Amino acid sequence: MKIIFAGTPDFAAVALRRLIEAGHDIVLVLSQPDRPSGRGMKLTPSPVKRLALDNGIPVLTPQTLSLKRAPEEAAAVHRQLCEANADLLVVAAYGLILPQVVLDCARGIGRNGDIRAINIHGSLLPRWRGAAPVARAIEAGDAESGVTLMKMELGLDTGPMVCEVRTPITDTDTGDTLMMRLADMGADLLVKALETPDELTWVPQPEEGVTYAEKLLKSEAVIDWTQPAEVIARKVRAFTPFPGTVFTKDDIPVKIWEAVPVEGSGQPGEVLDTHGALTIACGTGAVKATILQKPGKPRMPAPSFLQSLKFTVSEVVK
């Protein structure tokens, strides 16, 4: 099958690799422009762009696909997409808004021939439409997550559903581990669906149960110690690897990368124990932090971290 693929991060690269391995003809790839990365802030291509170039696939990296914002650039990309003569557009975490002309650029598959663009979305729609479905599911304490293959339309993840796959969210899942598990599941689901392209059908999303996964902000990283321990521990897991969770001790920002809720009571932010881990009181209960990080330093197990930065029982952190 001739496919145009649009995606940017590792989540999308997993699907692109699986499509290549399955023998599909990837005629063109869309990905976001190179971004500064690392300490040297060197321009770095996205995982999807690197994979495409490694496989000799042409890549387009427009700043926008909007004719209003960049009429010449967008029109040129629209023309290239239509001239690719693809059967299907596959989208996975691309990151740019796709206008209708892009959604209609492929010939289409499915029983009615009307599935021209299909999206790999990391949630069980209609729950967690939007930019950060994986992290928001963990943060909310959802028992399960999954991947939905969706026929794309202009609305924000509102398109009808082709198929889905589910997975439990474990007590140790982080945003990173769940994301990559869903990436594998979504890639498998897509490849299997494309084995019988003429049989694919879709159903509208349920009208009830709609929630939105807002984009993660750096400002959300700051821990509010008045919240329950269970909520804070979920945020630690959900916000790994981005934006992380942080508190301050003597004006030093400290990130927590692993923590579990435990019994304990005290003033919110009060240090309760420093033996083997850092236990801090919350609005209800306490969290025991087992992996922490200081600015400019690697993540460290709590015993080593507590040797490098001293905490006193009963002191209050912010």
Task: Please identify what each model-predicted range represents.
Residues 220, 226-318:
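An anion-binding loop in the catalytic cleft
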Residues 1-241, 294-296, 315-318:
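One-carbon transfer enzymes
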